[in-house]
Amino acid sequence: MKLRDATPADAARLDELLTKLIHDEAQYDSNLNGSYVVTDNYLDRIGLEGHKLLLIEDEGEIIAFLYGFLYEIPGMLAKPIAILDALYVEEAYRRKGCAAQLISAFKSFAAESGVCRIELKVLSNNETALHLYEKLSFKETKKYMTMELA
């Protein structure tokens, strides 16, 4: 398996994997449309300064990806932060170190960019993801709350 930066030629496959991520997360969030299909989401972000799209290939097939970006509010934040926005590993490749490898590479990108931390959001009932992030030294520091209206 090979980890590398995404190229424009990878954009359609990354959209497919993001679609799968949304479908997976729909089981934890009733407001997610489990039949939604992502199109043209990543093409413009590949190579964009402050954005990182990483992927893992196995025999030429993209089987996992991570998308993250740098976030800064001058004057409000003492240092910029990195946001880990999306992480997906094909089911057959889970629990084989792919997610850890992607996060490690993103951590290096973030550190080289001078950020003070990486932040992410995870659905509170997604125990598998919570366990992964805790194992990789992420800690709960904020709580996001929602109020259902309908």
Model-based region annotation:
Residues 44-55, 83:
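A short helix-loop-beta-strand connector motif used in the catalytic cores of GNAT acetyltransferases and
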Residues 110-121:
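Conserved GNAT acetyl-CoA-binding A-motif
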Residues 119-129, 146-150:
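Conserved beta-strand-loop-alpha-helix junction that forms the acyl-donor binding cleft
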Residues 22-42:
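Conserved GNAT-fold acetyl-CoA-binding loop/helix
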Residues 2-16:
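A short beta-loop-alpha structural element at the N-terminal edge
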Residues 1, 60-65, 82:
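Glycine-rich phosphate/pyrophosphate-binding loop shared by adenosine-nucleotide-utilizing enzymes
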